[in-house]
Amino acid sequence: MSSHPPAPRKHVTIHELRRMKESGERIAMVTAYDATAARLVAVAGVDAVLVGDSLGMAVQGHESTLPVTLDQMVYHSAMVRRGLARGDGRAHLVTDMSFGSYQASADEAVKAAMRLVAEGGAEAVKLEGGAEFGEVIRRIVRAGVPVMGHIGLTPQSVHKMGGYVVQGKDSEKAQQILRDARALEAAGCYALVLECIPSELARIVTSQLRIPTIGIGAGPHCDGQVLVLNDLLGLDASFTPRFVKRFGEVGAAVQDAVGAYVGEVKARAFPDDAHSFHSSSVRLVPVERHAEAAEEEPPDAIGAPI
Protein backbone atom coordinates (compact mmCIF):
# COMPACT_ATOMS: atom_id res chain seq x y z
CA MET A 1 0.00 0.00 0.00
CA SER A 2 1.45 3.40 -1.03
CA SER A 3 2.21 5.91 1.71
CA HIS A 4 2.20 8.82 -0.72
CA PRO A 5 -0.69 11.30 -0.27
CA PRO A 6 -3.10 11.54 -3.21
CA ALA A 7 -2.10 14.07 -5.84
CA PRO A 8 -4.02 17.35 -5.56
CA ARG A 9 -6.80 17.72 -8.10
CA LYS A 10 -6.04 20.06 -10.97
CA HIS A 11 -7.68 23.45 -11.15
CA VAL A 12 -10.57 23.49 -13.61
CA THR A 13 -9.86 25.90 -16.46
CA ILE A 14 -11.86 26.72 -19.58
CA HIS A 15 -9.72 24.15 -21.41
CA GLU A 16 -10.50 21.49 -18.81
CA LEU A 17 -14.23 22.14 -19.27
CA ARG A 18 -13.81 21.57 -23.02
CA ARG A 19 -11.91 18.35 -22.31
CA MET A 20 -14.72 17.20 -20.03
CA LYS A 21 -17.24 17.69 -22.84
CA GLU A 22 -15.07 15.78 -25.29
CA SER A 23 -14.58 12.89 -22.86
CA GLY A 24 -18.22 12.76 -21.80
CA GLU A 25 -17.52 13.66 -18.18
CA ARG A 26 -20.41 15.67 -16.77
CA ILE A 27 -19.73 19.15 -15.34
CA ALA A 28 -21.17 19.85 -11.88
CA MET A 29 -21.74 23.54 -11.16
CA VAL A 30 -23.53 25.34 -8.31
CA THR A 31 -24.00 28.91 -7.19
CA ALA A 32 -22.36 30.43 -4.14
CA TYR A 33 -22.64 33.93 -2.72
CA ASP A 34 -20.25 34.03 0.24
CA ALA A 35 -16.98 32.57 1.49
CA THR A 36 -18.52 29.93 3.75
CA ALA A 37 -20.72 28.46 1.03
CA ALA A 38 -17.84 28.59 -1.46
CA ARG A 39 -15.55 26.63 0.85
CA LEU A 40 -18.20 23.98 1.48
CA VAL A 41 -19.06 23.41 -2.18
CA ALA A 42 -15.38 23.37 -3.13
CA VAL A 43 -14.63 20.64 -0.60
CA ALA A 44 -17.69 18.75 -1.87
CA GLY A 45 -16.02 18.52 -5.27
CA VAL A 46 -17.89 20.82 -7.65
CA ASP A 47 -16.17 21.61 -10.93
CA ALA A 48 -17.38 25.19 -11.24
CA VAL A 49 -19.00 27.85 -9.07
CA LEU A 50 -21.27 30.59 -10.35
CA VAL A 51 -21.65 33.83 -8.43
CA GLY A 52 -25.09 34.39 -9.87
CA ASP A 53 -27.14 37.54 -9.90
CA SER A 54 -29.73 35.13 -8.50
CA LEU A 55 -28.36 36.45 -5.21
CA GLY A 56 -30.91 39.21 -5.67
CA MET A 57 -33.64 36.66 -4.96
CA ALA A 58 -31.77 34.05 -2.91
CA VAL A 59 -29.93 36.46 -0.59
CA GLN A 60 -31.35 39.97 -0.89
CA GLY A 61 -35.04 39.06 -0.95
CA HIS A 62 -35.94 40.73 -4.25
CA GLU A 63 -38.55 39.28 -6.61
CA SER A 64 -36.13 39.34 -9.56
CA THR A 65 -32.44 39.68 -10.38
CA LEU A 66 -32.87 43.17 -11.84
CA PRO A 67 -32.01 45.28 -8.74
CA VAL A 68 -28.57 43.67 -8.32
CA THR A 69 -25.72 46.09 -9.06
CA LEU A 70 -22.26 45.59 -10.49
CA ASP A 71 -20.71 46.70 -7.19
CA GLN A 72 -22.65 43.97 -5.41
CA MET A 73 -21.51 41.35 -7.91
CA VAL A 74 -17.89 42.40 -7.38
CA TYR A 75 -18.35 42.25 -3.60
CA HIS A 76 -19.88 38.76 -3.56
CA SER A 77 -17.46 37.43 -6.17
CA ALA A 78 -14.48 38.48 -4.05
CA MET A 79 -15.97 36.69 -1.04
CA VAL A 80 -16.49 33.52 -3.04
CA ARG A 81 -12.95 33.67 -4.41
CA ARG A 82 -11.59 33.76 -0.84
CA GLY A 83 -13.83 30.87 0.15
CA LEU A 84 -12.70 28.72 -2.77
CA ALA A 85 -9.09 29.34 -1.80
CA ARG A 86 -9.90 27.90 1.64
CA GLY A 87 -11.41 24.84 -0.01
CA ASP A 88 -9.34 22.77 -2.41
CA GLY A 89 -8.86 25.65 -4.86
CA ARG A 90 -9.94 23.48 -7.79
CA ALA A 91 -13.28 24.95 -8.87
CA HIS A 92 -13.60 27.29 -11.85
CA LEU A 93 -15.16 30.64 -10.84
CA VAL A 94 -17.68 32.42 -13.07
CA THR A 95 -19.47 35.65 -12.10
CA ASP A 96 -22.63 37.07 -13.60
CA MET A 97 -22.65 40.46 -15.23
CA SER A 98 -25.49 42.39 -13.61
CA PHE A 99 -28.42 43.94 -15.43
CA GLY A 100 -27.33 47.22 -17.01
CA SER A 101 -23.61 46.47 -16.89
CA TYR A 102 -23.29 45.25 -20.49
CA GLN A 103 -26.45 46.18 -22.41
CA ALA A 104 -25.72 49.87 -23.06
CA SER A 105 -22.40 49.58 -24.91
CA ALA A 106 -19.48 47.28 -25.55
CA ASP A 107 -17.12 49.76 -23.88
CA GLU A 108 -19.10 49.66 -20.64
CA ALA A 109 -19.33 45.89 -20.86
CA VAL A 110 -15.56 45.50 -21.18
CA LYS A 111 -14.96 47.76 -18.18
CA ALA A 112 -17.52 45.85 -16.09
CA ALA A 113 -16.03 42.47 -17.04
CA MET A 114 -12.54 43.66 -16.15
CA ARG A 115 -13.76 44.79 -12.73
CA LEU A 116 -15.27 41.39 -12.03
CA VAL A 117 -11.92 39.77 -12.83
CA ALA A 118 -9.57 42.32 -11.24
CA GLU A 119 -11.60 43.12 -8.11
CA GLY A 120 -13.94 40.14 -7.86
CA GLY A 121 -11.44 37.38 -8.60
CA ALA A 122 -13.58 35.85 -11.35
CA GLU A 123 -11.97 33.70 -14.02
CA ALA A 124 -14.82 34.33 -16.44
CA VAL A 125 -18.04 36.30 -16.70
CA LYS A 126 -21.50 35.19 -17.74
CA LEU A 127 -23.99 37.32 -19.62
CA GLU A 128 -27.51 36.70 -20.88
CA GLY A 129 -28.78 37.09 -24.42
CA GLY A 130 -28.47 35.80 -27.95
CA ALA A 131 -26.86 36.84 -31.21
CA GLU A 132 -27.59 40.51 -30.53
CA PHE A 133 -24.76 40.46 -27.97
CA GLY A 134 -22.21 38.95 -30.34
CA GLU A 135 -20.12 42.11 -30.65
CA VAL A 136 -20.19 42.70 -26.89
CA ILE A 137 -18.91 39.17 -26.33
CA ARG A 138 -16.18 39.56 -28.95
CA ARG A 139 -14.99 42.77 -27.32
CA ILE A 140 -14.88 41.24 -23.84
CA VAL A 141 -13.01 38.18 -25.10
CA ARG A 142 -10.52 40.37 -26.98
CA ALA A 143 -9.89 42.17 -23.68
CA GLY A 144 -8.77 38.84 -22.22
CA VAL A 145 -11.88 37.85 -20.26
CA PRO A 146 -13.55 34.50 -21.05
CA VAL A 147 -17.32 34.69 -21.52
CA MET A 148 -19.98 32.10 -20.71
CA GLY A 149 -23.22 32.66 -22.61
CA HIS A 150 -26.76 32.16 -21.32
CA ILE A 151 -29.83 31.59 -23.51
CA GLY A 152 -33.31 30.15 -23.17
CA LEU A 153 -34.99 31.65 -20.14
CA THR A 154 -32.93 34.73 -19.34
CA PRO A 155 -34.08 36.15 -15.97
CA GLN A 156 -32.86 39.68 -16.73
CA SER A 157 -35.45 39.74 -19.54
CA VAL A 158 -38.28 38.47 -17.34
CA HIS A 159 -40.60 41.36 -18.24
CA LYS A 160 -40.00 40.91 -21.96
CA MET A 161 -40.66 37.17 -21.68
CA GLY A 162 -43.82 37.62 -19.65
CA GLY A 163 -42.58 35.72 -16.62
CA TYR A 164 -40.43 32.72 -15.77
CA VAL A 165 -41.72 30.36 -18.46
CA VAL A 166 -40.16 27.58 -20.54
CA GLN A 167 -38.65 28.86 -23.79
CA GLY A 168 -38.34 27.22 -27.22
CA LYS A 169 -41.44 25.04 -27.07
CA ASP A 170 -42.53 25.76 -30.65
CA SER A 171 -40.49 25.18 -33.80
CA GLU A 172 -39.80 28.84 -34.60
CA LYS A 173 -38.55 29.72 -31.11
CA ALA A 174 -36.54 26.51 -30.94
CA GLN A 175 -34.80 27.42 -34.20
CA GLN A 176 -34.00 30.87 -32.82
CA ILE A 177 -32.41 29.36 -29.71
CA LEU A 178 -30.29 27.10 -31.92
CA ARG A 179 -29.24 30.07 -34.06
CA ASP A 180 -28.35 32.04 -30.93
CA ALA A 181 -26.29 29.15 -29.59
CA ARG A 182 -24.25 28.96 -32.79
CA ALA A 183 -23.81 32.73 -32.85
CA LEU A 184 -22.54 32.83 -29.27
CA GLU A 185 -20.04 30.06 -29.96
CA ALA A 186 -18.85 31.96 -33.04
CA ALA A 187 -18.54 35.15 -30.99
CA GLY A 188 -16.10 33.43 -28.63
CA CYS A 189 -18.11 32.00 -25.73
CA TYR A 190 -16.28 29.09 -24.11
CA ALA A 191 -19.45 27.58 -22.60
CA LEU A 192 -23.19 28.12 -22.70
CA VAL A 193 -25.94 27.94 -20.07
CA LEU A 194 -29.26 26.61 -21.37
CA GLU A 195 -32.09 27.52 -19.00
CA CYS A 196 -35.64 26.17 -19.03
CA ILE A 197 -35.83 24.78 -22.54
CA PRO A 198 -37.22 21.40 -23.66
CA SER A 199 -34.88 18.48 -23.12
CA GLU A 200 -35.10 17.56 -26.81
CA LEU A 201 -33.94 21.02 -27.87
CA ALA A 202 -31.10 21.01 -25.35
CA ARG A 203 -29.92 17.70 -26.77
CA ILE A 204 -29.79 19.13 -30.30
CA VAL A 205 -27.99 22.30 -29.20
CA THR A 206 -25.45 20.30 -27.20
CA SER A 207 -24.73 17.96 -30.11
CA GLN A 208 -24.14 20.83 -32.54
CA LEU A 209 -21.73 22.87 -30.40
CA ARG A 210 -18.06 22.27 -29.70
CA ILE A 211 -18.29 24.22 -26.44
CA PRO A 212 -19.85 22.73 -23.28
CA THR A 213 -23.50 23.33 -22.47
CA ILE A 214 -24.61 23.62 -18.86
CA GLY A 215 -28.28 23.09 -18.21
CA ILE A 216 -30.70 24.34 -15.60
CA GLY A 217 -34.17 23.04 -16.24
CA ALA A 218 -32.97 21.78 -19.63
CA GLY A 219 -32.99 18.02 -19.12
CA PRO A 220 -30.22 15.41 -18.88
CA HIS A 221 -28.51 15.81 -22.24
CA CYS A 222 -26.40 18.92 -21.52
CA ASP A 223 -22.70 18.56 -20.83
CA GLY A 224 -23.22 19.75 -17.27
CA GLN A 225 -25.76 21.01 -14.77
CA VAL A 226 -26.04 24.06 -12.54
CA LEU A 227 -28.42 24.69 -9.63
CA VAL A 228 -28.90 27.51 -7.17
CA LEU A 229 -27.33 26.29 -3.93
CA ASN A 230 -30.24 27.50 -1.80
CA ASP A 231 -32.65 25.47 -3.93
CA LEU A 232 -30.75 22.19 -3.88
CA LEU A 233 -30.23 22.51 -0.11
CA GLY A 234 -33.94 23.10 0.53
CA LEU A 235 -33.36 26.38 2.34
CA ASP A 236 -36.77 27.72 1.30
CA ALA A 237 -39.47 25.06 1.46
CA SER A 238 -41.97 27.47 -0.09
CA PHE A 239 -39.96 27.83 -3.31
CA THR A 240 -39.03 24.76 -5.32
CA PRO A 241 -39.07 25.11 -9.12
CA ARG A 242 -40.14 21.97 -10.97
CA PHE A 243 -36.65 21.35 -12.33
CA VAL A 244 -35.03 21.47 -8.88
CA LYS A 245 -34.26 18.34 -6.90
CA ARG A 246 -33.78 19.08 -3.22
CA PHE A 247 -30.71 17.12 -2.14
CA GLY A 248 -31.11 18.20 1.49
CA GLU A 249 -33.53 19.81 3.92
CA VAL A 250 -31.13 22.34 5.35
CA GLY A 251 -33.84 24.93 5.96
CA ALA A 252 -35.67 22.60 8.32
CA ALA A 253 -32.39 21.67 10.02
CA VAL A 254 -31.58 25.36 10.59
CA GLN A 255 -35.00 26.00 12.10
CA ASP A 256 -34.65 22.96 14.38
CA ALA A 257 -31.18 24.01 15.54
CA VAL A 258 -32.11 27.64 16.21
CA GLY A 259 -35.31 26.52 17.92
CA ALA A 260 -33.28 24.27 20.23
CA TYR A 261 -30.94 27.18 21.00
CA VAL A 262 -33.85 29.49 21.85
CA GLY A 263 -35.35 26.81 24.09
CA GLU A 264 -32.13 26.29 26.05
CA VAL A 265 -31.57 30.02 26.50
CA LYS A 266 -35.11 30.48 27.80
CA ALA A 267 -34.69 27.50 30.13
CA ARG A 268 -31.28 28.78 31.32
CA ALA A 269 -29.71 25.53 30.15
CA PHE A 270 -27.25 27.30 27.85
CA PRO A 271 -24.50 28.15 28.40
CA ASP A 272 -23.68 25.36 30.84
CA ASP A 273 -20.37 24.80 32.63
CA ALA A 274 -18.81 23.09 29.60
CA HIS A 275 -19.42 26.19 27.48
CA SER A 276 -18.18 28.74 30.03
CA PHE A 277 -14.74 30.08 30.98
CA HIS A 278 -13.32 29.97 34.52
CA SER A 279 -10.45 31.57 36.42
CA SER A 280 -9.26 31.12 39.98
CA SER A 281 -7.34 34.42 39.95
CA VAL A 282 -10.14 36.85 39.14
CA ARG A 283 -10.28 39.64 41.76
CA LEU A 284 -13.88 40.52 42.43
CA VAL A 285 -14.90 44.09 43.22
CA PRO A 286 -17.38 44.34 46.11
CA VAL A 287 -20.84 45.42 45.06
CA GLU A 288 -20.69 48.48 47.35
CA ARG A 289 -17.50 49.80 45.75
CA HIS A 290 -18.86 49.17 42.27
CA ALA A 291 -21.96 51.19 43.08
CA GLU A 292 -19.88 54.08 44.49
CA ALA A 293 -17.69 54.13 41.40
CA ALA A 294 -20.75 54.28 39.19
CA GLU A 295 -22.06 57.31 41.07
CA GLU A 296 -18.79 59.19 40.48
CA GLU A 297 -19.01 58.82 36.68
CA PRO A 298 -20.10 61.85 34.64
CA PRO A 299 -23.87 61.79 34.04
CA ASP A 300 -23.43 61.32 30.29
CA ALA A 301 -21.12 58.30 30.59
CA ILE A 302 -23.32 55.43 29.49
CA GLY A 303 -20.59 52.92 28.67
CA ALA A 304 -19.13 51.62 25.43
CA PRO A 305 -21.50 50.72 22.59
CA ILE A 306 -21.86 47.09 21.61
From Swiss-Prot:
3-methyl-2-oxobutanoate binds at residues 53-54, 96, 126. Coiled coil: none annotated. Mg(2+) binds at residues 53, 96, 128. One of its GO terms (cellular component) is cytoplasm. Keywords: Cytoplasm, Magnesium, Metal-binding, Pantothenate biosynthesis, Transferase. GO terms for biological process: pantothenate biosynthetic process. Binds 1 Mg(2+) ion per subunit. It is an enzyme of class 2 (transferase). One of its GO terms (molecular function) is 3-methyl-2-oxobutanoate hydroxymethyltransferase activity. Homodecamer; pentamer of dimers. Catalyzes the reversible reaction in which hydroxymethyl group from 5,10-methylenetetrahydrofolate is transferred onto alpha-ketoisovalerate to form ketopantoate. This is 3-methyl-2-oxobutanoate hydroxymethyltransferase.
